[in-house]
Amino acid sequence: MKISVIIPSLNPDDKLVSVVDSLVKKGFEDIIIVNDGSDSAHLWPFEKVGSYSQCTILTHEVNKGKGRGLKTAFEYCLKNRQGYDGVVTVDGDNQHRADDIYNCCEAMVKNDKVVLGVRRFDGEDVPFKSRFGNNMTSMVFKVMCGLNISDTQTGLRAIPYRYLDTFCNIEGERFEYETTMLLEFKKSDIQFMEVPIETVYIEDNASTHFNPVKDSIKIYKVIFKYSFSPTVVKYILSSLASWVICLLYTSPSP
């Protein structure tokens, strides 16, 4: 497999080094880390992994958001990684195990689909805000967008190379970008599948830069904007018309 691992990172600690070490040990040979405007006190992890032959560091001088970080890496791969099977996006806080990352990449290559590494949210160690947020968003996705995705917040996503250009040209610069990516599955008829992964929360997910209020508002704004787009409204009306016709033809005669 020829895979680029993409890790967007803001103010990382030693967990980023642990993630990269585990990837190198697993045999990944191309790891792209995006420094999204980290402050001077948090540059040492980038300097550490930047010395590895497997790693490339891309830098934003100021913080631009996770979405822009992913786009920066996608654009880099389009220019410099032609002929690769694809990329896999990974969080830098050690929540994704190297074995799970490898399994998602294998599934992507075998099935030629986007692969989402999905967690279970019924364990006692899962923070309440993560369980509630994912369950709520999954329900909204299913009801309003017609997408059945069990883990809408997963950062572990293996993406075939041919989709990178599409994902470079969709809206979103921060956490809402990952939601827009999922909505693009339906809009552009992108095939996807889910692969179960280990559910890991370290220090109650304390290292996350996700703002529960501000970022959630942005995410739901994206979902509702999509839900009332002309394409989806047309789909809903078409489905409603089909349902009415079905009722008319299956109702017993008076």
Task: Show where each model-derived region lies.
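Conserved short acidic donor-positioning loop in nucleotide-sugar-dependent glycosyltransferases
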Residues: 11, 36-38, 64, 73
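Short, well-formed alpha-helical segments that are part of the catalytic scaffolds
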Residues: 11-25
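Short beta-strand/loop segment that forms part of the nucleotide-sugar
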Residues: 29-38, 58-60
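A conserved acidic beta->alpha catalytic loop
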Residues: 35-44, 94
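Acceptor/aglycone-binding surface of glycosyltransferases and processive sugar-polymer synthases
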Residues: 61-64, 68-79, 98-175, 202-210, ...
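Short beta-strand-to-loop acidic/aromatic patch adjacent to the donor-nucleotide binding site
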Residues: 84-93
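Catalytic donor-sugar/metal-binding loop of nucleotide-sugar-dependent glycosyltransferases
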Residues: 173, 183-200
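Conserved small/polar residues in nucleotide/adenosyl-binding loops
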Residues: 249-254
